[in-house]
Amino acid sequence: MHLVPADRADRRTIDGHRVCDAIAAIGDAGRVRAWADRFALLADPKRLALLLALHRTGPLAVSDLAVATGMNDPAVSQALRLLRAAGVVAGEKEGRVVRYRVVDADVAGLLGHCAADG
């Protein structure tokens, strides 16, 4: 069965069956966009450092993350705000201290691969 969309059906292919397999592998455009957004979050070295620290150690407070990454507290807070808005991390308040942790299972899986290579 060919999955070539009608707007591309008139174009010549060399390996038509592979083109159909490639279209199936790409899948839903919304899912591709969601993964691209995740990768964009991970593309910033400072955000990636924060996520690697959280993935390896578990929940940490902003000030502890700042010391671990060499960032200042406001920069850590801003990065965590972005990661929280994207659903990648969540904060758990304990008194006046908020400790953050990675909650996105897909991102955690990617971080596991990154950490294993280091």
Annotate each PLM feature.
Residues 97, 103, 110-118:
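Short, charged, intrinsically disordered terminal tails
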Residues 80-81:
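Short, hydrophobic-biased segments on the C-terminal half of alpha helices
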Residues 1-42, 109, 114:
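N-terminal leader segment of winged-helix/HTH proteins
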Residues 25, 29, 33-72, 94, ...:
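N-terminal helix-turn-helix DNA-binding core of bacterial DNA-binding proteins
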